[in-house]
Amino acid sequence: MPNGYSIGDPIIQVKNVSLKLGGNQILRDLSFDILDILREGATTGQIVGLLGPSGIGKTQLFRILAGLNKPDSGEVLIGHPGAPVQRGMVGVVAQHYPLFEHRTVWSNLMVAGAHSGKPQADRERRANDLLDRFKLLDRKDHYPAQLSGGQRQRIAIGQQIMCSEQFLLMDEPFSGLDCVALDAVQELINEVTHAHELNTTIIVSHDISAVCEIADQVVLLGREPDENGKQIPGAKVMAKYDLGEMGLAWRKGITADPDFHRLLEEIRQRFPLL
């Protein structure tokens, strides 16, 4: 384990979650913990990737983690010692970064912050801090249609930080992006997550490289084979990788590390079998 790196208590616990839709088993006894990560002398959060091929049930798991849907059985606990997840406990960033088009940037943030239950003055201070950090103070009176794609992303993420300062859940944030845009989104996710040691960003995606390049932990979802090699319906956790413990958590130049490429190849080889 790298010097100065240690693992703390579970901050998200997924316990035996199962879900059926239309008679089809989508998730089956799915369990994993997301553990707090501590780095000596560093103030930084963590990024966790939930990886799986298309159609494996990632969207349904996303909604359960966000408290938007309930599983048929099992539970999701948030924080330490752990409380059942409820809508609003986790900030949710949808795939296409939806905003209130008829409201200004400032109003978008303040409407989102109203769900936090914090006093007006605290919400205004938080919104100003976010706009300053995202270099958008001069856009606070603009409408979403006047923003670039990258600026919209920042405001959509800012909305969710206004709601939940600790947990951020992102659905396929890299989908359909070219290399330049993908790099910008990765940089933004790193910036938001590492701004505070309590922050945890969970990325649900099928993009192996984009997730592993910035993740501290990766959970691989898939369907377990039976004794004849036939897939049993319902996604489970097939593997979990602690990239921090492996010395492969995000750092400058990680993509040039041969061990990092071996990890990518291992995951890529498993994907078709999931």
Q: Which residue stretches match the model-derived regions?
A:
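The feature captures the beta-strand-to-loop junction immediately N-terminal to the Walker
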Residues: 51-53
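Short coil-to-helix segment of the ABC ATPase nucleotide-binding domain corresponding to the Q-loop/switch region
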Residues: 103-110
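Conserved signature/switch motifs of ABC ATPase nucleotide-binding domains
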Residues: 142, 163
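Conserved ABC ATPase signature
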Residues: 143-147, 151
